[in-house]
Swiss-Prot record:
Upregulation: By stress conditions e.g. heat shock.
InterPro entries linked to this entry: ATPase_NBD (IPR043129), Chaperone_DnaK (IPR012725), Heat_shock_70_CS (IPR018181), HSP70_C_sf (IPR029048), HSP70_peptide-bd_sf (IPR029047), Hsp_70_fam (IPR013126)
Name of the protein in its database record: Chaperone protein DnaK
Family: Belongs to the heat shock protein 70 family.
Function field: Acts as a chaperone.
Pfam families in UniProt: HSP70
Source species, domain of life: Bacteria
Keywords from the UniProt entry: ATP-binding, Chaperone, Nucleotide-binding, Phosphoprotein, Stress response
Positions bearing Phosphothreonine: T198
GO molecular function, one term: ATP-dependent protein folding chaperone
C-alpha cells in the first residue's frame, strides 16, 4: 500500500515528510536539503527550473523567476493586496482569463495553482526517489486563515501535480499535531506561525490523543516577504539619497537587493551587525556604482517593528474567541522561519508571558504534522482525533445587502447548518443565493464565494415561500451550499467555486500540460546524459588514437576518425536518436580499437628490450646479492 506524504506548501520554502513506523522522516531533496525554495524559473532554452536551481539563477533572470506565488493563490486580480504585491516583485502579475491574479513568464500566463503544482511535483519526486515507488496521495497544509477560494485553489494544485489530496490541513493545526504526538505535551497551547507570506495563530486543547482547535486568526498577507520589502526599501532609499538613482526601477538590481535583504535579515538573527556589499549594482554616465552599507539589528528591528506588532492583534482575537487568557496557555509553539528573529521571539514572550517552546524545528514541524495526519487517514496511526475549525463566518446576502451568517467563525468542522428564508417580492419566480465568507456586516464587504439560482418557484405573495438554505463544510474547510423550496421539494446545489477559480476543464488541461512537460523534461535529461556519454567516448577514442596509433591498423584508424566526426556533428544538434546512433557506432569502433591494442600487446615477445628515452635498448639484467661478510 503506497504511503501518504505530508507536504508543507510554503510561500518561501516547501517541505515533505512521511511516517515510517512510529517516527516521521523529513525527506531530503535531490540537492541534499530538507527544505526546497518555492521558486520556479523559465530559462531562455525553455527549461523549467524548480527550487534551488531556480533560486541560483534568479539574479540574472528576474522577470521569469516566480516566487511567493502562494500570496496570489485564490485571489482576484482587482484585490487591493494584489496591487500591493505588483510593486514588490520583478515578474509580471496579470489578469487571468477568469479574472483571478495570474503570473506571466516568457510570454505565457500561469495560474498560481499551476506554479504551486510545479513545487508539489518536486515534493512528489523527492518522496518517490526515497521510497522507490510511485506516490499518489498527500495531505497538504494551508494557512489557517485561508478562505474557501484559496483552499480550493490549493487542492487544484495537488490535482495538477498528479496527487489525490486526501486532506487540506491548517498549518498551525499540523504543527500542534507534530508537537502533541509526544504524550507528555498536553494542555492548552498557542501556535504562533509567521512564515514567508502569511501569519496564523491558533489556540488548541491537546489531551488523550484529541487535538481540538478552539480558535484561529491571522493575516494571509503578512510574512517574511513583507519584512524583506522593508529592508529592500531602506537599501534603495539610502542608495538613492547618496547616488540619485532609484534601484527599484531596475529589475536586475531589485532582485540583487532582495537576495541581499533576505541574507542580511537571516544574519542579524545571530549577529548585531552585517555589511551589505553589492558591487556594480548599477551605472550612470560617471561609471559603475557600488552599494556598500552596514545594517544593524537595531535598525532592522525599527524597520519592521509595526509588522511584528500587527501579529499581536490576531493573537488577542484568538484568545478572546477561545475564551482563555494568555496566562492559561501552557505552551507556545513557534512555526515559520521568521520566528527565528530575536525581536519576534521577544514580542511573543512578552505577549503570552512565557518562553516559547524551543524543541520544534520551525521549518519542518508543519510537514511532520501533515505526515502524521496522512498516517491517521490511512489507519496507520490510531487514537488520534483532530477537530479543526472554519476560520471565517459563512452566510448569504439578504434584503438590503446585509450579510446573514449561517455558520460562525471557529465552528468545529465538518459541520452542516440550515436556515429558512423567503422572497422579497410578490410572485417572485426565482431567488439568487449569493454566498459570502467574512466578518463584515454588509455582504459586499466580505469575500464573495459564488452564487446560484433556484428557479421555478410557484407564484405566491412575498414572504410566503419557504426556501431552506443549507451550508455544509467538509473536513478540508471547503464549502457546499444547497437551496430547497420546501413547498415543491425543488432543490439546487453547488459546490462553491469562486467567481474566478479553475474549472475542471482548466485543471484537466493543466494536468496534461504537466504530464507533457514531465515528458519533455525526461527527454531533455536523456539528451544531456547522451551528450555526456558521447563527449566522454570521443575523448577516450581520440586519446587511444594519439597514444597507441602505431598499434592500430590504418583502416581502423580511418573508421574511428569517421565515427568521431559523425558524433561531433550529432553533438551540435538536439536530435537524441541521431546522437544515440552515432555514439553506438563510435562505441563499436572503440571496442575494435581496444581489441587491436590488446592483441598487439599480447603478441609482443616477452623479454624484448624496450626502447629507452634516447632510443637505446634497455635490458633487464639478473643480479646476485653479495654478502659483504664473505668478502671481508
Amino acid at each position: 500500500m503506497s504511503k501518504v506524504i505530508g507536504i508543507d506548501l510554503g510561500t518561501t520554502n516547501s517541505c515533505v515528510a512521511i511516517m515510517e513506523g512510529k517516527d516521521v522522516r523529513v525527506l531530503e531533496n535531490a540537492e541534499g536539503a530538507r527544505t526546497t525554495p518555492s521558486m520556479i524559473a523559465f530559462t531562455d532554452s525553455g527549461e523549467r527550473l524548480v527550487g534551488q536551481a531556480a533560486k541560483r539563477q534568479a539574479v540574472t533572470n528576474p522577470s521569469n523567476t516566480l516566487y511567493a506565488v502562494k500570496r496570489l493563490i485564490g485571489r482576484r486580480y482587482d484585490d487591493p493586496t494584489v496591487a500591493k504585491d505588483k510593486d514588490l516583485v520583478p515578474y509580471a502579475i496579470v489578469r487571468g482569463d477568469n479574472g483571478d491574479a495570474w503570473v506571466e513568464a516568457r510570454g505565457e500566463k500561469y495560474a498560481p495553482s499551476q506554479i504551486s503544482a510545479f513545487v508539489l511535483s518536486k515534493m512528489k519526486e523527492t518522496a518517490e526517489a526515497y521510497l522507490g515507488e510511485p506516490v499518489t496521495q498527500a495531505v497538504i497544509t494551508v494557512p489557517a486563515y485561508f478562505n474557501d477560494s484559496q483552499r480550493q485553489a490549493t487542492k487544484d494544485a495537488g490535482r495538477i501535480a498528479g496527487l489525490e489530496v486526501l486532506r487540506i490541513i491548517n498549518e498551525p493545526t499540523a504543527a500542534a499535531l507534530a508537537y502533541g504526538m509526544d504524550k507528555k505535551n498536553t494542555g492548552t497551547i498557542a501556535v504562533y506561525d509567521l512564515g514567508g507570506g502569511t501569519f496564523d495563530v491558533s489556540i488548541l486543547e491537546i489531551g488523550d490523543g484529541v487535538f481540538e482547535v478552539k480558535s484561529t486568526n491571522g493575516d494571509t498577507f503578512l510574512g517574511g516577504e513583507d519584512f524583506d520589502a522593508r529592508v529592500i526599501d531602506y537599501l534603495a532609499s539610502e542608495f538613492q539619497r547618496e547616488q540619485g538613482i532609484d534601484l527599484r526601477k531596475d529589475k536586475l538590481a531589485l532582485q540583487r537587493l532582495k537576495e541581499a535583504a533576505e541574507k542580511a535579515k537571516i544574519e542579524l538573527s545571530s549577529s548585531k551587525e552585517t555589511e551589505i556589499n553589492l558591487p556594480f549594482i548599477t551605472a550612470d554616465a560617471s561609471g559603475p556604482k557600488h552599494l556598500v552599507l552596514k545594517l544593524s539589528r537595531a535598525k532592522l528591528e525599527s524597520l519592521v517593528d509595526d509588522l511584528i506588532q500587527r501579529t499581536l492583534e490576531p493573537c488577542r482575537k484568538a484568545l478572546k474567541d477561545a475564551g482563555v487568557s494568555a496566562g492559561e496557555i501552557s505552551d507556545v509553539i513557534l512555526v515559520g522561519g521568521m520566528t527565528r528573529m530575536p525581536k519576534v521571539i521577544e514580542a511573543v514572550k512578552q505577549f503570552f508571558g512565557k518562553e516559547p517552546a524551543r524543541n520544534v524545528n520551525p521549518d519542518e514541524v508543519v510537514a511532520i504534522g501533515a505526515a502524521v495526519q496522512g498516517a491517521v487517514l490511512k489507519g496507520d496511526v490510531k487514537d488520534v482525533l483532530l477537530l479543526d475549525v472554519t476560520p471565517l463566518s459563512l452566510g448569504i446576502e439578504t434584503l438590503g445587502g446585509v450579510f446573514t451568517r449561517l455558520i460562525d467563525r471557529n465552528t468545529t468542522i465538518p459541520t452542516k447548518k440550515s436556515q429558512v428564508f423567503s422572497t422579497a417580492e410578490d410572485n417572485q419566480p426565482a431567488v439568487t443565493i449569493k454566498v459570502y465568507q467574512g466578518e463584515r456586516e454588509m455582504a459586499a464587504d466580505n469575500k464573495s464565494l459564488g452564487q446560484f439560482d433556484l428557479t421555478g418557484l410557484p407564484p405566491a405573495p412575498r414572504g410566503v415561500p419557504q426556501i431552506e438554505v443549507t451550508f455544509d463544510i467538509d473536513a478540508n474547510g471547503i464549502v457546499n451550499v444547497s437551496a430547497k423550496d420546501k413547498a415543491t421539494g425543488k432543490e439546487q446545489q453547488i459546490r462553491i467555486q469562486a467567481s474566478g477559480g479553475l474549472s475542471d476543464a482548466d485543471i484537466q488541461r493543466m494536468v496534461q500540460e504537466a504530464e507533457a512537460n514531465a515528458e519533455a523534461d525526461k527527454q531533455r535529461r536523456a539528451l544531456v546524459e547522451a551528450r555526456n556519454q558521447a563527449e566522454s567516448l570521443v575523448h577516450q577514442v581520440e586519446k587511444n588514437l594519439k597514444e597507441q596509433g602505431d598499434k592500430i591498423a590504418e583502416a581502423d584508424k580511418g573508421e574511428a576518425e569517421s565515427a568521431i566526426s559523425a558524433t561531433r556533428t550529432a553533438l551540435e544538434g538536439d536530435d537524441l536518436a541521431a546522437l544515440t546512433q552515432a555514439t553506438e557506432r563510435l562505441s563499436q569502433v572503440a571496442m575494435k580499437i581496444g581489441e587491436a591494442m590488446y592483441k598487439a600487446q599480447s603478441e609482443a615477445p616477452t623479454g624484448e628490450a624496450e626502447a629507452g628515452p634516447n632510443g637505446e635498448k634497455v635490458v633487464d639484467a639478473d643480479f646476485e646479492e653479495v654478502d659483504p661478510k664473505k668478502h671481508s
